[in-house]
Amino acid sequence: SEVFAKSHPNIKLNWIRDSTGIIAARVLAEKDNPKADVLFAMAVTSMTGFAKMGIFEPYSPKGIEKLNPLFLDGKKPAEWVGHYGWASAMCFNTIEAGKRKMPPPASWVDLTNPVYKGKITMPNPASSGTGYLMVAAWIQMWGETKAWEFMDKLHENVGAYSHSGSKPCEQAAAGEYVIGLSFPFRAIRLKEQGAPIDIVLAQEGTGWEMQTGAIMKGTKN
């Protein structure tokens, strides 16, 4: 928003930032009378459903031809455009783990080890896109039966569920928990700031998502 304000000083920007599930619910509630002009950095898994409802204004931004086709919806003009891709990851506090002689996890299954009981925090999949991404990935990798068995065991070790996908890594970085299930770029930023965390990508594989943007149909701005 700061960069936009500098390049467009005559435009007042009012923006609402929240978890994927919360924003998605708001978009659905306002679909017949949208309050927003632009939907920005929204999960493509949500955007494809919104596009089917016809709530976006088709628009191809300048330079769109330079983008990888994988970042586009394939329509001309486009209804949504991808910004970046991301994945899920574990944030492991090496200092707190050392105090408790806890081994670093290498896989998702490792998180069910009783040694981690109460020392894991993860995003709530009901409100967080990151949490939803993890659940979806586990089901895709293992099938529903095995995935839900895993999640039941994982739940026994989870000390807290957060509203957002970034908070678990922040909690792990602060030493509130040993392991925070989050995403890599939050972990990288915290690590660069000096947090004693290692970034772990699970051996079994990890879910990924793409953030996108679109213009709401009927916007006056």
Annotated model-derived regions:
Residues A106-P114, Q211-N221:
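Bilobed periplasmic-binding protein/Venus flytrap-like ligand-binding cleft at the lobe interface
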Residues A25-N33:
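Short, well-structured alpha-helical segments in soluble
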Residues T45-G49, A173, Y177-P196:
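A ligand-binding cleft/hinge motif common to bilobed small-molecule-binding domains
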Residues K66-P69, F150-H155, Y161-S162, Q193-K217:
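Periplasmic-binding protein-like
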